[in-house]
């Protein structure tokens, strides 16, 4: 067995065969006992070198000096190990040789050999070989160890040291020189995690320098550089503060006031560019922006994914440690969490043994495997191999008895390994039973046995100094000297895991590959997933059943830590939220989803995250919900699964508060309901003093809540009653208000009646004013009328003139403003009245100017920020100047108006004959219309026009014409008729006056238009004359209808259109009067029949017809010829169009008489008709002798119109029947019966007297006006030679409309005309015609009757056979 071991060692490492037992036992320990050095078995010098190199770890203050980095390479130490099998790779040397250190002799190798991760594979061989010696050799060793234990060793470190106080033990670094290294001397924050991302806009060397500089100035625990620290560096560049400020604006992309590494690198890059002569860009290019932003995103992801280190004692168990925490053997080991023993080395590396490739054994907690002979370093198993002892594991013993707890704390100096080292227990509770404590810190040669190939147990072997020997009998089962260590076979066997969990507790099987570097106290990753951290364990106080394999390998193994959002995450997420929320407090779904989408997660994960975040299902996220969503997103990116339901630790606090409030409200409401309904028994309302005490107490205990609830309910009911009472009171007030409003509404609804009364009163007042004005107008007769007229015209034109002046001035002002705007297009656009600039306009322009100035600053252009202000001021001044000029012009115009009023007021007083009390203000108000309402102004202007066109021409007329209207008006006022009749009369008069201004009527206008369409412009003068005569209905209007006014009639159509509105109103009033006229029509029809009979009798007198001219015959034939004329209206119209000018030119005398509407008095004097009879008929027609409603008072109307047609009727009475055709040219008597003597024409006297004819004939045109309207053109259709009968028929019907038609052919021709047909034919149709004519006898002509007449006259296409007149040419079809 021993030879096999040696052969194995020689085969492995190639060393010459030797006897390690003798060297190790006799010479090794005996020589080193007085010197307290390790055994010298031919490997003394290397061991001494190793110990000398490790002297720095003896004293407590030197514990961190020899911290070794993780970059050790085991192959670098192998030459030393191959020099001798007995070289103990000591990591904790004794203090007797302080001169030799690892850094002096082998600096690089010692750094590598002292690392926790990469320990030499030969370390455990010493212990393993020592375990193979015979018991007598072990006794010798124990003796030597006991001798060496005289001089105790000092406590020494057995673990790995991450940070040492002496920089000499750190890896050598280049000397700090230059700007960057000057800051690096202050220390670098190597814990800062910066992603390995290459920035393309700087070189790799610059990026490395900037990273070093960044690490030197960054604050501990932060990944950003504050503005103050960054300013201290940037100011050393020597640039101007303005340039540095611009560089900061470009670099601080997040506007956080702090710089991350990519931003800091960008700032340094920009500074270098400026120092090299480049300019600072106004904006970063897109590539640089994208690189910096992606770098920042990577940093944020790393910040979120990185968990804080060493926050809890369990963190070391959760994650594999790259470097171990230093542990002193004199301090309390981590027995409360993991393994009870301290590490006696670093992470164990598999080392070659003399008998086989054994796996490294972990001999401590988090430390490296170290031998337990000198300095607790691992011993090689080749030759005198000492078994490596794991302090803190569970040893396997067949006795299945629990191990006793080994003390590793203070004051346990049973074992010393080179000084006063604390005792380390190598055993703990195990299913194998109690094992005696084994000291690893002294020179006590404990003996441990390890099984060999033949399964023979080996005596325990000491791993430390000279201590009391352990029992070497084979009765004790081999004990593992480490934690979870499998028994190792020291010769020819498969390498066993010396730091693994024993098979007895976990069932781990040995494997052939090397162990991974691991620390004692952390379970190796061979039995469970390395990514799953261990839970906290108590290894020294029992309950070791938690080490059961099911706890680690079972599916129930999971992380127990709660998932929470750290403060760093919250600050980062809140900053992102505030960036996008725009101070609204919430983030809409579109923005939040877009932020989540940038993570690259799939749709299902994002939907699940959104459902978890949007707790209230509002479609938007608040700050805490957004932070929760980002946490879940980053958790998913880091590999964590998305929970189906939020754990309580992730539920936002706001949601918790709301849920608690909801639950409280629900519970309180449910309790209240339950109390109110569950205690509705008799006891709730009964107070029985005889109840027993327990019941009484129960009542006292239970009822207060119900009583309080009842009181609260009563209070609530009282409040409800009060509210109901208030509500009723409010409703009552509302009803009262509504009722009051209804009353007002009813009053308003009755307003139409009141309005009617008011309108009637207003109309009455207007009438009185008009009459008073007429009286005043004729009071002062000393002033010529033409002067009055001129003055009135000027005054009436003043209002219109001033209005036009104001309008023109306003237009000029607006045009100037518009011109000013076009001249300055860049000026501020004014939105105020008249294009003025308001404060809002200035504010908008100022914001635009500010934006423009910023753009100019960015683009390097000049700053013209003051130009908009200057432009706005100049534009405003120009507008104000224009407005002031306009106001000044208006003031001048006002002064002119006041001057005119001051001059015109006394003139008006003189003209009216009143005292000069009219002031200029009153004159402006009542003459010009300043300050009056529109209706009042219109009435004043209408009154003035009436004075101009009515009162003044009346002075020019005869006194007879002037006397009639005032007398009629006075008579009406004297009679005291009711107000309605006065209003109707006044309306009728106003209508007559307005129509009289143009000398036409509405009906005549339409006839004129139809005649113009048919005539092609012939006889324009005669038609207006006829219209004037026919439209005149008062003596005042008859004066206006003189031939001098015939020019005005040409524009009658346009003026009448302006009066349509007033006519419409008057029509409505006249329609009411038509109903009253129906009774009178019947009476008038009877009178007409009687007159027709009288006319037939008069036809029997030939002498009268012969003595009278053709005019008499024509007038007498009109009533008889009306039915006959109906057969030829169209043909006669055609001849009328062509022959009318001829008839006008032929007879000058007859034309004069015909055109003179006031020639009728001469005709009346020459007529043989009974005057008294005619007067009586006239009175009957006028309604003076009948019960009239007042309508008959417009004598002027009936006086003028009837006289036109009646002249034909009297002609029928006084003339012979064979002379009807002659009357076509004599319709001159149609004019109203105004006594204007014009008897120059000899033939005209034949016409009957106008007074007598007018009443009888007036009814005829009124009744037969419809038919007459259709035949109004027939009077002009007769030829020069003849056609008197048909012309007479037309004239009789048309007399009422066109007085100038009286132009007739010579009288001699009339005598030759055959007599008209007998009258009996006319008796039947005449009443119908009279009915229609009566309908049209109203002041306003009815167009329906006109068209009906035309239709009736249209079929008549031939003249009567009895006439003997040659038929006229046929009319064209219309």
UniProtKB/Swiss-Prot annotation:
The alphabetized UniProt keywords are: Actin-binding, Calcium, Cell membrane, Coiled coil, Cytoplasm, Cytoskeleton, Endocytosis, Endosome, Membrane, Metal-binding, Repeat
Mark out the compositionally biased spans (Acidic residues).
1186-1197
State the Gene Ontology BP annotations. Answer: actin cortical patch assembly; axial cellular bud site selection; bipolar cellular bud site selection; cell wall organization; endocytosis; endosomal transport; positive regulation of Arp2/3 complex-mediated actin nucleation; reticulophagy
Membrane topology value: Peripheral membrane protein
What is an example of a GO molecular function annotated in this UniProt entry?
A: actin binding
Q: Where in the cell is it found?
A: Cell membrane; Endosome membrane; Cytoplasm, Cytoskeleton, Actin patch
**Bias regions of kind Polar residues — which residues?**
1-10, 20-33, 1027-1053, 1124-1168, 1201-1222, 1257-1266
Check the record and name the InterPro entries matching this protein. DUF1720 (IPR013182), EF-hand-dom_pair (IPR011992), EF_Hand_1_Ca_BS (IPR018247), EF_hand_dom (IPR002048), EH_dom (IPR000261)
Q: Which GO terms describe its cellular component?
A: actin cortical patch; actin cytoskeleton-regulatory complex; endosome membrane; nucleus; plasma membrane
SMART domains reported for this sequence: EFh, EH
Renumbered to this chain, the Pro residues biased-composition regions fall at: 1299-1320, 1365-1374
Coiled-coil boundaries: 706-783, 1050-1103
**Region (Disordered) location:** 1-33, 52-114, 668-737, 971-1374
Q: Which residues form the EH domain?
A: 206-295, 569-657
Pfam families the record matches: DUF1720, EH
> Which positions are annotated as binding Ca(2+)?
614, 616, 618, 620, 625
Q: Where is the composition biased (Basic and acidic residues)?
A: 708-737, 971-1012, 1063-1102, 1169-1185
User: Biased composition, Low complexity: where in the chain?
Assistant: 1103-1118
Subunit note: Component of the PAN1 actin cytoskeleton-regulatory complex.
Task: Indicate the family of this protein.
Answer: Belongs to the PAN1 family.
* Summary of the function given for this chain in its UniProt record: Component of the PAN1 actin cytoskeleton-regulatory complex required for the internalization of endosomes during actin-coupled endocytosis. The complex links the site of endocytosis to the cell membrane-associated actin cytoskeleton. Mediates uptake of external molecules and vacuolar degradation of plasma membrane proteins. Plays a role in the proper organization of the cell membrane-associated actin cytoskeleton and promotes its destabilization.
Protein name in UniProt: Actin cytoskeleton-regulatory complex protein PAN1
Species name: Candida glabrata (strain ATCC 2001 / BCRC 20586 / JCM 3761 / NBRC 0622 / NRRL Y-65 / CBS 138) (Yeast)
């Amino acid at each position: 067995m021993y030879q096999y071991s040696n052969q194995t060692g020689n085969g492995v490492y190639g060393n010459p065969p030797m006897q390690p037992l003798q060297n190790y036992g006799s010479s090794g320990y005996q020589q080193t006992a007085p010197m307290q050095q390790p055994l010298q078995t031919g490997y003394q010098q290397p061991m001494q070198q190793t110990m000398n190199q490790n002297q720095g770890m003896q004293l407590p203050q030197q514990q961190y000096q020899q911290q070794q980095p993780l970059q050790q390479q085991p192959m670098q130490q192998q030459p030393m190990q191959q020099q001798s099998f007995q070289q103990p790779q000591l990591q904790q040397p004794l203090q007797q040789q302080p001169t030799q250190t690892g850094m002096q002799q082998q600096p690089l190798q010692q750094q590598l050999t002292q690392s926790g991760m990469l320990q030499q594979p030969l370390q455990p061989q010493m212990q393993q070989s020592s375990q193979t010696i015979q018991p007598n050799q072990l006794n010798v060793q124990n003796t030597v160890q006991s001798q060496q234990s005289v001089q105790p060793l000092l406590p020494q470190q057995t673990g790995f040291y991450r940070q040492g106080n002496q920089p000499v033990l750190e890896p050598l670094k280049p000397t700090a020189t230059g700007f960057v290294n000057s800051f690096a001397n202050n220390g670098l924050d190597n814990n800062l995690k910066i992603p390995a991302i290459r920035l393309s806009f700087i070189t790799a060397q610059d990026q490395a320098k900037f990273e070093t500089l960044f690490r030197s100035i960054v604050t501990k625990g932060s990944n950003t550089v504050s503005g103050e620290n960054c300013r201290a560096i940037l100011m050393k560049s020597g640039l101007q503060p303005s340039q540095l400020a611009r560089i900061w604006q470009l670099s601080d992309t997040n506007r956080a006031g702090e710089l991350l590494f990519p931003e800091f690198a960008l700032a340094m890059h920009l500074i270098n560019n400026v120092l090299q002569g480049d300019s600072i860009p106004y904006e970063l290019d897109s590539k640089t922006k994208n690189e910096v932003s992606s770098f920042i995103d990577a940093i944020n992801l790393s910040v979120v994914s990185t968990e804080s280190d060493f926050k809890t004692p369990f963190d070391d168990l959760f994650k594999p440690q790259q470097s171990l925490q230093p542990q002193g053997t004199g301090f309390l080991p981590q027995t409360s969490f993991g393994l009870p023993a301290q590490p006696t080395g670093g992470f164990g590396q598999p080392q070659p043994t003399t008998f086989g490739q054994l796996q490294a054994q972990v001999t401590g907690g988090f430390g490296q495997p170290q031998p337990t002979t000198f300095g607790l370093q691992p011993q090689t198993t080749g030759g005198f191999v000492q078994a490596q002892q794991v302090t803190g594991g569970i040893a396997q013993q067949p006795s299945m008895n629990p191990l006793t707890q080994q003390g590793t704390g203070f004051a346990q100096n049973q074992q010393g390994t080179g000084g006063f080292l604390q005792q380390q227990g190598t055993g703990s509770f195990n299913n194998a039973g109690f094992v005696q404590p084994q000291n690893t810190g002294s020179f006590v040669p404990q003996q441990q046995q390890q099984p060999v190939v033949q399964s023979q147990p080996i005596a325990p072997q000491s791993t430390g100094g000279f201590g009391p020997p352990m029992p070497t009998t084979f009765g004790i089962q081999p004990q593992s000297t480490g934690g979870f260590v499998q028994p190792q076979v020291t010769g020819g066997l498969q390498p066993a895991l010396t730091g693994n969990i024993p098979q007895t507790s976990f069932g781990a099987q040995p494997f052939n590959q090397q162990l991974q570097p691991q620390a004692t106290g952390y379970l190796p990753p061979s039995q469970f997933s390395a990514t799953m951290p261990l839970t906290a364990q108590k290894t020294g106080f029992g309950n070791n059943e938690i080490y059961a394999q099911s706890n680690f390998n079972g599916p129930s193994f999971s992380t127990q830590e709660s998932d929470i959002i750290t403060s760093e995450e919250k600050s980062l997420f809140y900053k992102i939220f505030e960036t996008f929320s725009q101070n609204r407090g919430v983030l809409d779904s579109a923005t939040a989803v877009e932020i989540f989408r940038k993570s690259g997660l799939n749709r299902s994960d994002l939907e699940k995250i959104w459902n978890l975040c949007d707790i209230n299902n509002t479609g938007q996220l608040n700050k805490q919900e957004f932070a929760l969503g980002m946490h879940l997103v980053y958790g998913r990116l880091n590999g964590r699964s998305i929970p189906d339901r939020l754990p309580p630790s992730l539920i936002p606090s706001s949601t918790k508060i709301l849920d608690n409030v909801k639950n409280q409200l629900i519970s309180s409401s449910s309790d209240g309901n339950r109390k109110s309904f569950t205690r509705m028994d008799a006891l709730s309302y009964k107070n029985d003093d005889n109840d027993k005490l327990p019941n009484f107490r129960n009542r006292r205990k239970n009822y207060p809540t119900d009583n309080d609830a009842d009181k609260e309910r009563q209070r609530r009911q009282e409040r409800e009653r009060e509210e109901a009472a208030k509500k009723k009171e409010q409703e009552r007030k509302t009803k009262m208000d509504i009722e009051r409003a209804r009353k007002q509404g009813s009053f308003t609804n009755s307003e139409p009646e009141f309005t009617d009364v008011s309108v009637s009163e207003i109309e009455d007042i207007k009438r009185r004013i008009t009459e008073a004005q007429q009286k005043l107008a004729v009071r002062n007769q000393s002033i010529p009328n033409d002067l009055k007229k001129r003055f009135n015209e000027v005054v009436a034109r003043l209002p219109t003139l001033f209005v036009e002046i104001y309008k023109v001035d306003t237009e000029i002002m607006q045009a100037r403003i518009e011109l000013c705007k076009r001249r300055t297009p860049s000026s501020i656009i004014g939105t105020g009245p008249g294009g003025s600039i308001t404060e809002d306009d200035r504010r908008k322009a100022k914001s635009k100017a500010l934006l423009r100035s910023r753009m100019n600053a960015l683009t390097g252009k000049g700053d013209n920020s003051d130009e908009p202000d200057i432009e706005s001021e100049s534009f405003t001044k120009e507008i104000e100047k224009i407005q002031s000029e306009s106001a000044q012009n208006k003031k001048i115009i006002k002064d002119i108006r006041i001057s005119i009023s001051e001059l015109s007021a006394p003139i008006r007083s003189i003209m009216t004959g009143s005292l000069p009390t009219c002031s200029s203000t009153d004159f402006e108000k009542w003459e010009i219309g300043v300050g009056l309402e529109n209706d009042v102004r219109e009435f004043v202007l209408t009154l003035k026009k009436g004075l101009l066109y009515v009162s003044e021409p009346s002075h020019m007329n005869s006194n007879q014409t002037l006397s009639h209207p005032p007398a009629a008006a006075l008579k009406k006022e004297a009679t005291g008729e009711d107000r309605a009749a006065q209003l109707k009369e006044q309306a009728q008069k106003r209508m007559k006056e307005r129509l009289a201004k143009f000398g036409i009527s509405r009906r005549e206008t339409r006839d004129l238009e139809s005649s113009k369409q048919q005539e092609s412009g012939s006889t324009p003068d005669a038609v207006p004359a006829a219209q004037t005569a026919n439209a005149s209905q008062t003596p005042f209007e008859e004066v206006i209808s003189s031939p001098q006014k015939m020019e005005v009639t040409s524009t009658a159509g346009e003026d009448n259109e302006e009066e349509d509105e007033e006519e419409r109103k008057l029509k409505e009033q006249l329609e009411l009067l038509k109903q009253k006229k129906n009774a009178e029509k019947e009476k008038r029809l009877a009178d007409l029949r009687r007159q027709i009979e009288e006319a037939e009798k008069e036809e029997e007198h030939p002498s009268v017809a012969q003595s009278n001219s053709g005019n008499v015959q024509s007038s007498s034939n009109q009533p008889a010829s009306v039915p006959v004329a109906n057969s030829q209206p169209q043909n006669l119209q055609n001849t009328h169009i062509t022959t009318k000018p001829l008839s006008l030119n032929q007879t000058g005398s007859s034309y004069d008489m015909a055109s003179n509407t006031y020639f009728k008095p001469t005709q009346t004097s020459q007529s043989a008709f009974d005057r008294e009879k005619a007067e009586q008929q006239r009175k009957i027609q006028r309604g003076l002798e009948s019960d009239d409603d007042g309508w008959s008072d417009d004598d002027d109307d009936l006086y003028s119109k009837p006289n036109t047609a009646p002249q034909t009727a009297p002609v029928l009475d006084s003339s012979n029947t064979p002379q009807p055709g002659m009357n076509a040219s004599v319709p001159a008597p149609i004019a109203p019966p105004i006594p204007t003597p014009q008897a120059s024409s000899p033939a005209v006297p034949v016409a009957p007297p106008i007074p007598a004819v007018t009443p009888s004939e007036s009814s005829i045109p009124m009744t037969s006006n419809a038919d007459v309207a259709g035949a109004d053109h027939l009077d002009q259709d007769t030829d020069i030679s003849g056609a008197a009968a048909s012309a007479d028929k037309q004239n009789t019907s048309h007399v009422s409309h066109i007085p100038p038609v009286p132009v007739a052919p010579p009288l001699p021709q009339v005598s030759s005309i055959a007599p008209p047909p007998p009258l009996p034919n006319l008796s039947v149709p005449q009443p119908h015609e009279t009915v229609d004519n009566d309908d049209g006898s109203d002041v306003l002509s009815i167009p329906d009757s006109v068209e009906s007449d035309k239709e009736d006259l249209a079929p008549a296409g031939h003249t009567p056979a009895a006439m003997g007149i040659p038929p006229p040419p046929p009319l064209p079809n219309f």
